């Protein structure tokens, strides 16, 4: 997966978890805002991920998948975080699950090669997008 451009991606107050008055910010600039969950600077509910806990979860999941041979396709649609998609795939997930072709586009833009659509593929534009991706990338796996 190619995450090289993610820090220059922008978000604004319409993005889940961002203060409505925040304006447009590059992801790389969010940490410099001085926002605090405990001061009420960010709209709730929101998810908080501790790096140490994420690392332990990652190690555990990798070991579990290796030991059991289980095949999983975690829900990317919940976080829509390509950084987590990358980690999950590195840990042994066989695909990332999405609910819409818009979510699939995000995955594909960052190089996810195997996607499970947990929905019916309907609509001319949606079908056209998937067919186009399958033609463009013979390695792409659409489940």
What positions do the PLM features span?
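Alpha/beta catalytic barrel-like cores
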Residues: 1-42
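Short, functional N-terminal and low-complexity linear motifs
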Residues: 22-30, 49-54, 70-74, 96-98, ...
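Membrane-targeting and insertion segments and their boundary/processing signals
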Residues: 27-35, 58, 62, 77-78
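N-terminal, Lys/Arg-enriched amphipathic/low-complexity engagement segments
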Residues: 35, 43-47, 51, 55-57, ...
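A short alpha-helix capping/helix-coil boundary motif
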Residues: 37-42, 62-66, 80-85, 109
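A broad, structural surface signal
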Residues: 56-59, 63, 86, 90
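Structural signal for hydrophobic packing residues in well-ordered secondary-structure cores
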Residues: 58, 62-65, 134, 138
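Active-site-proximal beta-alpha core segment in soluble small-molecule metabolic enzymes
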Residues: 73-143
